[in-house]
Amino acid sequence: MKKSKFIVLLLLFCLQPGFLAAQRAEAIRKDVLNPRLDKVLVVAHRGNWSIAPENSVAAIDSAIQMKVDIVEIDIRKTKDGQLVLMHDDTIDRTTNGTGKVKDKTLAEIKQLRLKDKDGRLTEHTVPTLEEALLAAKGQIMVNLDKAYNIFDDVYAILEKTGTADLVIMKGGHPVETVKRE
């Protein structure tokens, strides 16, 4: 009797969405690291921007729902040193604001609304890197673009969110240099 109760509890635990998501992310990670992989991995550029604004949490969530393997997001640093998702140097194209990301504080950026692919305003706001990583955690790999030059800031957030193993980061230096640094 005790054994059957244990098995039922174990099954209930294993069927929880968080557990299954973590299993999925780890499987994707193994695929990424497999040099002999014989299948194609699907990457959503700036999330699923056809459904939600690019580089938004909603675009990441949509990519996860579509069972995409990797989501590519772009990072910029604000005037007060916070990391936000934004492809362009400026906020003009993707929000209802104007100016450069580096000239705005996080509070100013959080007041803005993101535009959809057709330029219409949405209810979505510009997410921080931390918000994006927490949305992706355990469910999908994340390819961080425009992040290498702010590596220390990015890595601190990866450590804080426990997502370092789920991130791919591009850089302009040879692997040997990166390992030394």
Model-derived segments and spans:
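Bacterial Sec-dependent N-terminal signal peptides
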Residues: M1-A25
